[in-house]
Structures are given as C-alpha cells and as structure tokens.
A protein has these predicted regions:
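N-terminal beta1-alpha1 cap of cysteine-dependent amidohydrolase-like domains
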Residues: 3-250, 260-378
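Catalytic His-Asp charge-relay segment
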Residues: 252-256
C-alpha cells in the first residue's frame, strides 16, 4: 500500500508537470482530468486479456486449446470505435512491459478461472496492473477496465493479492443500480446523461453472473476505501449487499460487477439478460466511456504494419454457442499462440509451410490421444 501511495504522489507531481507543458487541465482526486480535444487519439487500440480455458468450454472441443477470449468483449470495444489486440497469458514480465506501451488501455474480462493458477489470468493481470500504474506515474494516461472477474481482479491486485471476496449468489440476476449519494463525483458518471442514469436506477438492465462479491466492508478492512470510490451497490438473491461499480480516485482504473457486453452481444437462451432498447443504450454507454478514456492515451504502435501484426483480426472466431456454450462466439488459442512475425522475418515461405504442416500433425496427434486412441496415434 505504501508503494502505491508514493506512486500516486509521483503521478500527481508528474501530471502537474504535464499540465504546464501541454496545457491540459489536471485536477486532483475529487475532480476530473480534462484533455483538449485536439490531443485525443482518434484511433485507439485496446488490449483484451485472454484467460485459461474453462472446464465447460474445454470439454466442448477436442483440440488442445489453452486460452480464449469471448468475442462479446471484442465487439464491446469495437462497437465504441476501438481496435483490439489480444494479450496472452503465461508470458514473462518483459512481454507485458513491451506490449502495453503500444496500447491505449486494457480490458480485463469476466470468466471462470482462479486467481491462484500459476502463469494464468491473475499473474498476467498482476503484470498488467503494475505496468499500467507505471505508465500513469510516468505522466501518461492508461486506463484499465475490469468486468465481473476483471473487476474482482483489480481490487485483488490493489490489495497485493490478499483474497477478500465473499461467496455470494448473484447468478443470472438482472438488476438496476443502487447509486451512492455522491456518485456524480466520479469520472464514470460525472457527465452521464440523466436518461441513462434513470434507466440504470430503475430498470433491470444489468446482467449479473457471479459467485463472488466484494463488499464495502471488504474494502474498508484493507484500507482500499481510501483509494477507490464506490459509486453503486446491489443486493444478491440472498440479500447480501455488494459493490457493482467502482473506480480508482486518481488512476483511470474502473470496475463493474455486471456484464454490459452480454446485453448487446450474447443471445444464450434461458439467461436473464435484457435486450430491451434501454438495456442496449446503457450498455453502449459503458463501452463508449471506456473507449473515450482510451482516447486520452497518446501511445501508438510503430506503424500500420505493426498494428496489423497484432490485431485480433489475425485469429479465427468460433461459433461456441452452437455447442451450448454461454458465449455465442469465442477466440480459441493454442498454447504456442503468438502475434504474426514482421514482414521481413528471416523465415521464407517454404519454412512457413513446413511449420504449418508440423503444427497440423501435432494437433492431430493430440486430438487422437485425447480420444483415447493412444496406440493408434502416429
């Protein structure tokens, strides 16, 4: 906690220096950072963190996939005007230090994985969180957005890995938000149109699918209430009050416990997900807010070719809903997944073709072994 506090002091000092140099208006804690329109990035690129294959998703595929990204998160970001770069798990700290300075923000998605799995979602999240803090402390602007499990991960990392979530019962629960009296002091809701606030406060438009909750008491017990602002709460099926929206008081880090991407892009049957015009409208608000935060980041890839090598368009998307998944579509990644090599890489077309053939052979063998025909696998 002391280390983060000192970084925050440095952030304030550096931001004040940036104010003098760039003419931006930077106001502390209870106020908002404003950046002149001319300096806004009109081509934001946002990273979305992959995660381990869930048991249910892995069981539906014979292929040896090791991680995935639900396509609804990709569409959520793209629908607000940004491009997406997948961020891999099971990588060294150096990888995250190298990729984040090219991006304008990171989305930590919801899902079904554990924080104690080695080299997985949470470990990658730790690297991302630390690098994001440094980028902001150095005078940049780098937002993080956590949805559901991603929101839980943000506070887990802020607590230096001390588990503070409570078991709760908020699965398949559509709710309005119970706003705090001072919620308008937040960056997330300071300029939200009254119509959006009215819908959020009165209609069952937030889709909740979580078995863990974070309460205000949890934050206070760890001293996190000094750094994080709670804007709204909700009650689970059993009457437990939990935090539903949160943001860091200085850093551009945001968390929501519900799933706005599901209202717009998930069509799984028998799920309590509202698809009314009002539900779509408020869900789009959250996407727009996050992407507009990312527009305040001036970081860039080296050039257009560099972006093209990294964007998620390079990877196929699967119709997982056809297999009764809770996601309509997913990007499924093998363990050796990577970004495309530069155009001037030393490999020639012949060696590339050979590598593709070898990869196909290895996948076929793994599939054969998984189907318990080991003796016939060659």
């Amino acid at each position: 906690m002391m280390a983060l506090s000192s970084k925050i002091v440095a952030l304030v000092a550096l931001n004040l220096l940036v104010t003098l140099v760039k003419g931006a208006t930077v106001i502390l804690i209870e106020e908002e950072i404003e950046i002149p329109r001319a300096s806004l990035n009109e081509e934001p690129v946002i990273g979305i963190l992959a995660q381990e294959m869930s048991y249910s998703l892995a069981a539906k595929y014979e292929e040896d996939y090791e991680s995935y990204i639900a396509a609804s998160y990709v569409k959520f970001v793209e629908g607000a005007g940004a491009r997406v770069v997948p961020i891999w798990i099971n990588k060294s700290r150096e990888y995250y230090e190298n990729i984040l300075p090219n991006l304008n923000g990171v989305l930590l998605p919801g899902g079904a994985t554990w924080f104690n799995q080695s080299n997985g979602y949470a470990d990658a999240g730790r690297h991302i969180y630390d690098v994001a803090v440094e980028l902001n402390v150095q005078g940049g602007y780098f937002p993080l957005w956590g949805t559901c499990l991603g929101f839980e991960l943000l506070t887990y990392l802020a607590a230096n890995g001390e588990e503070h979530r409570e078991h709760c019962s908020s699965n398949n629960q559509a709710l309005p938000l119970d706003f705090k009296p001072d919620f308008r002091k937040s960056r997330m809701f300071a300029d939200t149109p009254d119509e959006i606030i009215e819908i959020l406060a009165s209609e069952d438009v937030t889709a909740n699918f979580h078995q863990y909750c974070i309460t205000e008491q949890n934050l206070t017990a760890l001293g996190l209430d000094e750094e994080w602002r709670v804007m709204s709460t909700n009650m689970d099926w059993n009457g437990l009050e939990f935090i539903s929206t949160i943001e860091h008081k200085i850093l551009p880090f945001y968390g929501i416990q519900f799933h706005p991407e599901k209202n717009i892009y998930e069509w799984v049957r028998n799920k309590n997900i509202s698809h009314t015009p009002n539900a779509i409208k408020v869900s789009q608000y959250f996407a727009d807010f996050f992407v507009n935060e990312a527009r305040k980041s001036e970081q860039r890839f080296q050039d257009a070719d560099d972006i093209d090598r990294h964007v998620i368009y390079n990877y196929p998307v699967s119709f997982t809903g056809l297999k009764k998944s809770s996601f309509e579509q997913c990007y499924l990644f093998e363990g050796n997944v990577d970004y495309l090599a530069p155009a001037d890489a030393s490999k020639d077309q012949g060696s590339d073709a050979s590598a593709l053939v070898q990869r196909y052979v290895e996948r076929s063998k793994k599939k054969c072994i998984k189907n318990k025909r080991r003796n016939s696998c060659k």
